[in-house]
């Protein structure tokens, strides 16, 4: 196990997984990461319920099983029409309680949520780790907080 995964596995570390591209692989289309153009996303979500058909990531499932759910959460930017599908996907496939799925409206709100989790769990920001697929988001979190930042690729060899 890598040093970073060992750190995430420590009981006091709060691990926060992004949903799209981390817990939910981009496999929306037939042999494609996308099933529609961005402008058609709302209609697609409302009519096709894509989160009901996405496969979970086995390496992350095993990690959460071993760590337990107490200090594991999911946090994702979501529009109101995406919330139910995202929450249901995480609860059904990763066993997290529904109140451990934090859905926010913007990347800035995600930063605020990470800070709030440090307070909620009475830990330093360093003990709150965001697992994310977007390097730009990881860079922003690293710049604005003291949180640990982890690219999802760290789980490829778990």
What positions do the PLM features span?
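Residues at the starts of beta-strands that form the adenosine-phosphate
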Residues: 70-71, 127, 148
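Conserved Lys-Pro-Asp/Glu-containing loop-to-beta segment of HAD-superfamily phosphomonoesterases
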Residues: 109-136, 141
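Short glycine/proline-centered loop/turn elements that form peptide/ligand docking sites
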Residues: 134-140, 151-158
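Structural beta-sheet core signal
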Residues: 73-76, 130, 151
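A short, structured active-site edge motif that brings together acidic residues
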Residues: 75-80, 87, 93-112
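Short, aromatic/basic amphipathic alpha-helical patches
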Residues: 85-95, 116-120, 140-146
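Short hydrophobic/aromatic-enriched beta-strand-loop microsegments
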Residues: 99-101, 147-156
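Alpha-helical substrate-recognition element adjacent to the catalytic core
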Residues: 2-89
